[in-house]
Every structure is written in C-alpha cells, then in structure tokens.
C-alpha cells in the first residue's frame, strides 16, 4: 500500500494544477493577512489568536475548494475507466481507497502548511514575533474539522456522481 500511496501522492502533487492553486492561495493569503490580520480583529493584536483565526477563516473556502479539486482527480471519467483495471488487482479496494484519500489529505495539508508558513514569515518579518505555540490550537480547531468533513463528504459525493463535487465546492461561498 505504501507504493500506491506514493504513486497517488506523486500524481496529485506533481502537476501544474497544484502549483497554480498554491500561487492563488498564497496571493490571497497575503492579501487577507494585510487586510484582516495586520490591523487586528476587535481591537486585538495582529498576532492574537482572534486575528489569526479570522485570517484562517477567510482562507478556509479556498482550501475547501482545493481539497475537493484533489478529489476530482479520483472521480474523473478517465479514473472510472481505470477503476476496472484496479478492481482486478489483488489489493483490497478499501485499502486502495484509503491510500487515495490519504494522498488527498497530504495535498490538503500542504495547502494549509503553505498558508501557515506565509503567516509565520509575515509575523516574523513584520513583528519579530515567533511564539507559534499560542496559535497552534486555533489553527487546528479552525482548519481540521471542516477540511476532514470536506474530504469525507466529497469522497462520498464523488462516488455517487462526480459533478456533485463541483456543486459541493460552492458550499462555503453560499454560507458567507
């Protein structure tokens, strides 16, 4: 299963789409940082958990879309045709699906880490502030539940009808 996981990670992470998505995410993250986190939220310091949470909350819809786009690699028409071949292998289909979902989770983690690294760079450069222990909990609480939900629900919707993933991408924007 490690070989399948590596192959799926390489397929997801070594393409032009990820580079474009990272570029858009980092540009948007920089804009959000300067517009939201830098002035502070509710008269708090820019490096307070409150301001950092507002920064991550604004980035969450874009990361949600990125997570679901990763799943579209596994639900495309080409993948459905290849599923006949993978079903004929002796590998357990559940373990194969778990390896693919884990690869998508690695891609989502990479997107989140890019946004967190940009914030760390800007906090260190602008304020000389590096106390990340106080912001780890807000990052985990804000990012983990919705993104795990996006991957799980997107996986189920994509197995039903692949086009439902694109409709599901609109959810965070409809809730704003």
Predicted regions mapped to residue ranges:
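Aromatic- and glycine-rich beta-strand/loop motifs that create alpha-glucan
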Residues: 1-25
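Hydrophobic alpha-helical elements at and bordering transmembrane segments
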Residues: 5-9, 96-97, 136
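Pore- or pathway-lining transmembrane helices of multi-pass membrane proteins that form conduits
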Residues: 19-25, 161-176
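Secretory targeting signals
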Residues: 27-74, 98-168
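Helix-terminus/helix-capping segments at the ends of transmembrane helices and short amphipathic helices
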Residues: 77, 86-87, 158
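Short helix-to-coil transition segments within interhelical loops
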Residues: 86-95
């Amino acid at each position: 299963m490690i070989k399948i996981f590596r192959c799926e990670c390489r397929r997801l992470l070594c393409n032009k789409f990820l580079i474009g998505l990272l570029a858009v995410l980092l540009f948007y993250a920089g804009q959000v940082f300067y517009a939201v986190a830098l002035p502070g939220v509710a008269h708090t310091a820019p490096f307070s958990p409150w301001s950092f949470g507002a920064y991550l909350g604004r980035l969450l819809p874009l990361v949600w879309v990125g997570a679901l786009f990763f799943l579209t690699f596994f639900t495309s028409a080409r993948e459905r045709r290849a599923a006949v071949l993978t079903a004929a292998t002796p590998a357990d289909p559940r373990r194969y699906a778990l390896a693919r979902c884990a690869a998508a989770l690695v891609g989502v983690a990479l997107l989140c880490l890019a946004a967190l690294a940009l914030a760390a760079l800007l906090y260190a450069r602008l304020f000389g502030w590096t106390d990340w222990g106080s912001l780890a909990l807000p990052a985990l609480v804000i990012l983990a539940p919705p993104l795990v939900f996006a991957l799980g629900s997107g996986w189920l919707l994509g197995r039903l009808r692949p086009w439902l993933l694109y409709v599901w991408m609109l959810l965070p924007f409809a809730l704003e």
